[in-house]
Amino acid sequence: MASKSTDISAIIKDRIRRFDSKIDYSEIGYIVTIGDGIALVNGLDNAKNGEIVKFKNNITGLVLNLEEEVVGVAIFGDANMLSEADLCTRTGEVIAVPVGDELTGRVINAIGNPIDGKGPINSTKRREIFKVAPGVMSRVEVNEPLETGIIAIDSMIPIGKGQRELIIGDRQTGKTSIAIDTIINQKDKNVKCIYVAIGQKNSTVAQITKKLQDSGAMEYTTVIVSGASELAPQQYIAPYSGTAIAEEWMSEGKDCLIIYDDLSKHAIAYRTLSLLLRRPPGREAYPGDVFYLHSQLLERAAKVNYSYGGGSITALPIIETQQGDISAYIPTNVISITDGQIFTRENLFHSGQRPAVDVGFSVSRVGSSAQIKAMKEVSSSLKLELAQYNEMQAFAQFGSDLDDSTIAILKHGHKVYELLKQEQYYPINQLAQTAILLGVKEKIINPLPASQLRRYRDEVIKFMTKELEGIKIGEKIKQNNNALNSSIKEEITTHLVKIVNKIIASLHDYKPEAELPMPAKYLEINNV
């Protein structure tokens, strides 16, 4: 009997000696009600706003409302797998996404998980998605152009690196096309691009991704998708996730371009979220902090000084209007936050003026400081010429007799509009744009019929990008601090006159009396 008790005590002592249990302390609550991607959770008394919580089946949520008895949680994942009384655990972490070069060429969802079937993202870095925007003293002046490759924008509504330029217009007026063309034009320009699709159809996003792949743009682009089929919480955080990824590259001294397509659907997602969380509605049922929703996002786009990395984030948010009404709540909010807007009109789009940019309503508040000197020189009078044309056209509709100067303004303006037409996925480099517009400024295009202006444009692009003489002229412009001097101007105009004469010579039914004459100083240049 004694030996048995000795054995038992030895076993107990041995177990006590080997006992190494760590106390697992975690705060656990339970779901009181759940629906529409929102769960009210009881028992998480110390939860913080913006904290990540975990449910079963590896589903996570974001704490958005802190009330006396419960916390409101937005669910990321399949909310149908959760039900009342399911447990919920605090993590003590805030929401973050993977960042770094590993995301280049990938398609991810709003929380940073890959959805392109190319395997996991092996990123070691993560970054919080809700951050404070850079302060005033950390920013520097926007003075470097971000080329869109679209002649109407680069000449009259220039965008600089670090700028926020709104693209606004009715549905189906080519807003996304402008943004995608801008991404494609960043090839070989050392700019990282991020395209955030908010509330878009999955088929539309698939088409855009394929186009980016076909044009080689996915080599420097990340696509973030929060589709129309996803719940409001994912659509709400998608643009912030994109900005966090861009901020990592900005801190490394890189230039980034981010497209938010579109912030109208983002505001609707936030309105849905707020109403489900029982927050008081305001104008158009949006919550009172909907202005802050977009200002905190867009203020993170900046050009920072070298102490903060020396990089930049250029933001192109897109807003969809109803019947061209830019005085609605969300459009006016975003217009007041951004540094200018590109306004697309439905009537221009249907009349064949594409991109359908309304030059009169569009503006860039950064202006010519975001242009190279050569472009500034050739495009300085362009907006005025088009304004005069639009004014004269209104008078011409009455059918009264017009004097010669009015006819000249009308003919010239019509030709300028023809030159501003540009096919989708057809970016034009800035030096070629400069040469094309020099022909407009110097009235070299006067003898050309309007139907031949696209041919003129293509010939100038070919000369400036493919022919040795044109490439040498481009190098001279770069060596001359991106400016034109009299000798460079003379070289370009000589070739422009030859191109115009060559086109005219190939036309069998050309009527010189129907067109304006070329300025006298260029008539002495020999025909080709």
From Swiss-Prot:
Belongs to the ATPase alpha/beta chains family. GO terms for cellular component: plasma membrane; proton-transporting ATP synthase complex. It comes from the Bacteria. GO terms for molecular function: ADP binding; ATP binding; proton-transporting ATP synthase activity, rotational mechanism. Its EC number is 7.1.2.2. SUPFAM superfamilies: C-terminal domain of alpha and beta subunits of F1 ATP synthase, N-terminal domain of alpha and beta subunits of F1 ATP synthase, P-loop containing nucleoside triphosphate hydrolases. It catalyses: ATP + H2O + 4 H(+)(in) = ADP + phosphate + 5 H(+)(out). It is an enzyme of class 7 (translocase). The keyword Ligase does not apply. Signal peptide: none annotated. It is found in: Cell membrane. PANTHER family: ATP SYNTHASE SUBUNIT ALPHA, MITOCHONDRIAL (PTHR48082:SF2). The gene is atpA. Keywords: ATP synthesis, ATP-binding, Cell membrane, CF(1), Hydrogen ion transport, Ion transport, Membrane, Nucleotide-binding, Translocase, Transport. F-type ATPases have 2 components, CF(1) - the catalytic core - and CF(0) - the membrane proton channel. CF(1) has five subunits: alpha(3), beta(3), gamma(1), delta(1), epsilon(1). CF(0) has three main subunits: a(1), b(2) and c(9-12). The alpha and beta chains form an alternating ring which encloses part of the gamma chain. CF(1) is attached to CF(0) by a central stalk formed by the gamma and epsilon chains, while a peripheral stalk is formed by the delta and b chains. ATP binds at G169, D170, R171, Q172, T173, G174, K175, T176. It is a peripheral membrane protein. Pfam families: ATP-synt_ab, ATP-synt_ab_C, ATP-synt_ab_N. Produces ATP from ADP in the presence of a proton gradient across the membrane. The alpha chain is a regulatory subunit. The record marks S362 as: Required for activity. This is ATP synthase subunit alpha. Gene3D superfamilies: 2.40.30.20, ATP synthase alpha/beta chain, C-terminal domain, P-loop containing nucleotide triphosphate hydrolases. The lineage of its organism: Bacteria, Bacillati, Mycoplasmatota, Mycoplasmoidales, Metamycoplasmataceae.
